[in-house]
Structure formats: structure tokens, C-alpha cells
């Protein structure tokens, strides 16, 4: 398939996505069925025999399957288990291991029940306080195995209202705990619903472009190996390119793809953030955001978690990916029918930052 994407002309990209990247209906039904089995197990059965009462407040599907950007043949799902027993971010950090241990124990026990006609293959972890439990699920009614990552989390958001921002005090507490623990981005799982909602309601064609970029990223990963920037950074870069450069339900896929690759090439200039869920209105959050946005670029802040710079800490990975992106710009997938090259959208690499109020009552702007 790599050879296919390298060699196909620009006007056939939509067909390529439809034929090779979009999951079919059987695949989608399998994943949905498997997710329902695991969710029911986690909510109704898993913690019944625990030494202390455990209450699951909700189970949220995250990752690609939650966002609606799954690639064909990738049967995996992230499930975040929100537990009322976890009462702070630090509590999640310290106690997640005990809940993962209990989930693992119950998965082993349920194998021996005849009425439970599914098989769990639990992956071993060398970490005593691992962030997640990984396992594979198979069942007679499924056409293939489905891989799961289950992550215990502190339910800091409670009921998520899609029409309004979370209380900014939540982010102030997050920032305070992350700063004191030195764990920026550690608790992004607590904001899985917001990460999912940020992408889930996007136009179908934008999700197709995200799939194409993810496929390109996987090809780069196979060729280059590690280190590379996280895939999530590329997903957010794709959303940013579309928002700034087009914003329409229908657009030229090759143009969008080229724009994303050009942003990758210009990674040293990137400073990107959104104010959908947090902004500069709360004093402590504002101070922290200004500090984050002054850091060495690239900076791409997780739209749901301001402590997570998903582009940070890996300049070598960005350099290698940028070199590969530069090579790709000369491939046929960016050539039009008349032989001319596909142009990119006009997209900035920097999102402006508002004035910062300082103690001496004068203001300065971050350039």
C-alpha cells in the first residue's frame, strides 16, 4: 500500500482513502460489539469482589475508535474507567496500579465461567504502577481479535456538558498538581471525553484527511523507526490546517494533505493551541498558558489538557519526519491532471497570544 500512496495521482486520493483506509461495516460492528462486552464487564462485574467497595462512574471510549478516525484493519480501542474511589490527580498516579491489578485478576477469573463466551489474552507489564492494562478479546461472534487498553482515571469532569467549557478551577487544580509533581501531560486520560468530542463532531471529509495523514505517519514509522513525534500531534496538526486554511465540509484532499506536510516541514515555527475548553480568563490558567507558549518550539497544546505539549521534547523526531515530508512533496500524489503541482492552503504556523497582565500593571505581548 506504501507504493500505492507514493505513486497515485492527486485526483485519486479520495478513492484511495475509500478503498484502503475506511473501515468496513463488519469491522465497525465487531469493534462496537467487543467494546460493549468490555464496558459491561467493567461496570457491572469487575469490582464486585474487591476488598473495598469500588464504584465505576463511567467508562469512556477514547483513541481512534472513540474519535471516529479508525484505520481499516486496526481493531483496537482505549477504554478509560472513571472511578469514584480516585479523588485527585495524585491519587490516580499513586493508586492506578491496584485497580489495574484487580481488573487483571477478574479477567483471569471470568475465563472459567462457561456462560461468559469470550476469551481475554492479557499482555504482561513489567511496570508495577503501569498506566494501563492491555489485552486482546476474542469471541465466537467476532471476525477478528480486538485489542484493548484500559486506563483507570480520576473523574474530575463529572458530567460533561458539550455546550460549555469546564469550570476553569479544574484546570487550575490540574496545573497546580502537575507543577508540584513534575508530571505535565500525565493526566490527559482524565480529559478523554473532551479529546474525543474535539474530533468526533468534525466533518466526515476532515476525518478522512486525518486517516490519510495517519496512514502516511505509519509508513514513515515503518521506514524511519523511532523516535518520531506522537501520532496525536499529527492529528491535531491536520485539524489546525483545515480550520485555518479551508474550514469547509468539502475540500481538495491533496491540498489538505500537502498543507499538513508543509506544517511538519516548518515544525520549528509551530505554536498552536485552542481555547475551546480552556482560555486566558482565569488568572492562574492564563499565567501557565503564557509560560507554556513561551517554550521552545514546536508547541502544540492538547486542546483538552493545557499541561500536555504533544509536540514537545522530541526535536530529533520532528527533524527526521520533516525530512521525509519534504521528499514526499515531490511524489505523484501532489501532481494535478495538467501536470502542475498541487498548492497548499495559506496557513500560519503561529497562533497569536493575547497580552499578559503583569504585576507592575504594564502589558507585553508574546511574539
UniProtKB/Swiss-Prot annotation:
Describe how its activity is regulated. Produced as a latent enzyme which is activated by dsRNA generated during the course of viral infection. The dsRNA activator must be at least 15 nucleotides long, and no modification of the 2'-hydroxyl group is tolerated. ssRNA or dsDNA do not act as activators.
**Record key words, sorted:** Antiviral defense, ATP-binding, Cytoplasm, Endoplasmic reticulum, Immunity, Innate immunity, Lipoprotein, Magnesium, Metal-binding, Microsome, Mitochondrion, Nucleotide-binding, Nucleotidyltransferase, Nucleus, Prenylation, RNA-binding, Transferase
Annotated catalysed reactions: 3 ATP = 5'-triphosphoadenylyl-(2'->5')-adenylyl-(2'->5')-adenosine + 2 diphosphate
Induction per UniProt is: Up-regulated in response to the type I interferon IFNB1, in a STAT1 and STAT2-dependent manner. Induced by polyinosinic:polycytidylic acid (poly I:C).
Q: Name one GO biological process term.
A: purine nucleotide biosynthetic process
**Compartments reported by the entry:** Cytoplasm; Mitochondrion; Nucleus; Microsome
PROSITE patterns, per the entry: 25A_SYNTH_1 (PS00832), 25A_SYNTH_2 (PS00833), 25A_SYNTH_3 (PS50152)
Task: Give EC number(s), comma-separated.
Answer: 2.7.7.84
**What are this entry's molecular-function GO terms?**
2'-5'-oligoadenylate synthetase activity; ATP binding; double-stranded RNA binding; metal ion binding
Q: Where is the lipid attached (S-geranylgeranyl cysteine)?
A: 364
- Tell me where it mainly resides: cytoplasm
Its EC top class is transferase
**Segment forming the signal sequence:** none
Region (Interaction with dsRNA) residue ranges read 14-61, 201-211
What is the disulfide pattern of this chain? none
Q: Which family, according to the similarity comment?
A: Belongs to the 2-5A synthase family.
How is this protein named in the record?
Answer: 2'-5'-oligoadenylate synthase 1A
Native species:
Mus musculus
